[in-house]
Amino acid sequence: MSCLLHPNSGNLPLPLCLLAFGEKGLALAFPYFVIVSVSQNTFGYAMIAGNLKWKEFFFHPIVISVTAAFIVKITDLTVPNMLLNTTSYLGYTAIPLPLLLLGYALPQISAGNIKIGIVYALARLVFGGISGLCVIYVLGLTGMLAGVVMIMASMPVALLNFIIAAERNVEPNNIGGIVIVSSLAMVVLIPLLVWFVLWAFPV
């Protein structure tokens, strides 16, 4: 279920929103990214692992980070440049780590895992596109905001689902297959998605 509900909301859709709509589009995409990230790292974790303790919820790095950012924002605190640079470099260093983990697991993914991956990947992409259109229709969104929602909702299965599955040993090969297939499908679908968004939701 987490694979269907939690798409890739960071390293793929954010650059796409920047490409399609510029800095304003990227700014609109960030709140969506934060909400999905918090949900994925807490409720998504519980869906895959089967449980989530309240202590794990409140002390999860993403929850602490969002809370700290919110406090800084509302209080207008000035964060020292040294701290900003340190956290930025640590963040850049962490980007390839999930990809290395998935690459390590690739030899263990069988044809059966890929078949399951195809089914769930198609379900995620269809579910994401339809849910995005429903949100746009229900909320009456137009223009850039509608386009950003459509891009964010139509993304493939997030790699984090595989990381959680590998950590808790809950069908990691099946979930790895889902992540791989849905991500490869987006290589073909991204140009079509960007074209559709710019055509359907002109700024």
Predicted regions and their residues:
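Alpha-helical transmembrane segments of multi-pass small-molecule/ion transporters
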Residues: M1-V203
